[in-house]
Design a protein with these regions (language model features):
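N-terminal accessory scaffold of Fe(II)-dependent oxygenases
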Residues: 1-234, 244-339
Length: 339
C-alpha cells in the first residue's frame, strides 16, 4: 500500500468494561471506533491462532450440507474483486461445497500465484449450525443480521452500507480505510446498477491510486482514517461510512453484524434514489426544481404544515408511518411500479 494510505490517521480506539457498556456505546454512535480484543475468546478466534487449517476445520464442522456461493478471481487480480477492462466482473461466481472450497484455499496457500477465493456475506444462521451461538457479540435488544466472510488475500473496493456495522476480525488480519459519508464525490463511484455486490464502489485503486485520473481522491484522503485489525479485534462502522477492506493474510475470516435502530418496515433509501434517477433526473431544469421543492416539503423538511389542515383520521401515509401505513404505501408502490 502506498505511503499516502499507510500514513493516514488511526481510527479511535476505545476500551470496553462489559457487554452493557457496548450496548450504550453503540447507541446513537456516528463515528467509527476500534475495540481491541472484543472477541478474542471466541472458539473460532482461538482455532485461527493455532492455524488456518484449524480454523477451517472448526468452521466446517458447523457447516450445513448445502451449496455455498463463492467468488474466484484469477491470480493476476492480486486479490482485487473488481471490474475487468470491459466493466464486467473480474471474478466468476459459482457454487460449491465448503470442503471443496476450503481445499482450494489450502492448495493456494502453497502457491506463489494463487487465485483469490472469497465467500462473501454468508448468513450464519442459514449456513451453519451452532457457529453463531458459540461465536457472537451480545448487542442488547438489537436483532442484527449476522454474516461471515471467508477468503484468501482480497481487496474490496470502497463502498458503503445503510445499516450500522460491527465488524469482528476472527481469523487473519484486515485493514479498513474509512471515509465519512460526504466524501462520495471524491471517491469516483462506479455504476449503481452493475456492481460486484449490490453497492456502488470506488473506481480508485487504493494500492496504486492514479491521481491524474482521480485528482479529488487526494481530498478524500484528507478525511480518511485507517485501522488494522488483528484476530479478536472489532471495528464499528456507522451507517453510510465508506470503507475499503483488505484481507491481509492467506486466510481471513470476518464476522459482522448489520442493524438499524429505525423500524424495519421503513423502505430502503437506495430504492428511492434509484427511482428518482429514473423519474426525475432527466426532466427539464424547471421541472426538477418543482420536484426538489416537493421533496423538501414532504421528505426533508416535513413538519406539521404537511398535515395540519387534514383531518387526523385521513392523513394516512402523510402522518408518521406505522407498520400498517407503511404496508399500504408499499402495496401502492408495487401497483404503480408494475404498470
Amino acid at each position: 500500500m502506498p505511503d499516502t494510505l499507510t500514513a493516514l490517521p488511526q481510527i479511535e480506539e476505545r476500551e470496553l468494561a462489559d457487554a452493557a457498556a457496548l450496548d450504550a456505546m453503540l447507541r446513537g454512535a456516528d463515528r467509527p471506533f476500534v475495540l481491541r480484543g472484543l472477541v478474542k475468546d471466541w472458539p473460532l478466534v482461538q482455532a485461527g491462532l493455532q492455524s488456518a487449517s484449524a480454523a477451517r476445520a472448526y468452521i466446517q464442522q458447523h457447516a450445513v450440507e448445502r451449496p455455498f456461493v463463492v467468488s474466484v478471481a484469477a491470480p493476476d487480480s492480486d486479490g482485487r474483486m473488481f471490474y475487468d477492462e470491459a466493466m464486467q466482473m473480474n471474478f466468476r461466481t459459482t457454487k460449491g461445497t465448503l470442503p471443496t472450497i476450503f481445499a482450494k484455499m489450502e492448495e493456494g496457500e502453497s502457491q506463489d500465484e494463487a487465485p483469490a477465493i472469497y465467500l462473501a456475506s454468508i448468513d450464519m444462521h442459514d449456513f451453519f449450525n451452532g457457529l453463531h451461538e458459540a461465536n457472537h457479540v451480545p448487542l442488547g435488544a438489537r436483532d442484527p443480521l449476522a454474516s461471515i466472510w471467508i477468503g484468501t488475500k482480497t481487496r474490496i473496493a470502497a463502498h458503503n452500507d445503510f445499516p450500522d456495522n460491527l465488524a469482528c476480525c476472527a481469523v487473519g488480519r484486515r485493514r479498513f480505510t474509512l471515509f465519512p459519508p460526504d466524501q462520495f464525490r471524491n471517491l469516483y463511484l462506479g455504476p449503481i446498477d452493475n456492481t460486484p455486490a449490490g453497492r456502488a464502489i470506488s473506481m480508485v485503486d487504493f494500492q496504486n491510486p492514479d491521481f491524474g485520473a482521480h485528482p479529488r481522491f487526494r481530498d478524500a484522503l484528507a478525511h480518511a482514517q485507517v485501522a488494522e485489525l488483528e484476530s479478536g479485534d472489532a471495528l464499528f462502522i456507522p451507517s453510510m461510512w465508506w470503507h475499503h477492506v483488505e484481507g491481509l493474510e492467506k486466510f481471513n475470516v470476518l464476522v459482522n453484524y448489520w442493524w438499524r435502530d429505525t423500524p424495519r418496515y421503513l423502505g430502503q433509501p437506495q430504492d428511492a434514489l434509484n427511482h428518482a434517477i429514473m423519474a426525475i433526473r432527466d426532466l427539464p431544469e424547471a421541472d426538477r426544481a418543482i420536484w426538489r421543492d416537493l421533496f423538501d416539503y414532504y421528505v426533508f423538511e416535513a413538519d406539521e404544515r404537511v398535515t395540519a389542515h387534514i383531518p387526523e383520521k385521513a392523513r394516512s401515509v402523510l402522518d408518521r408511518l406505522t407498520p400498517e401505513s407503511a404496508g399500504r404505501l408499499r402495496a401502492f408502490l408495487l401497483r404503480t411500479l408494475s404498470r
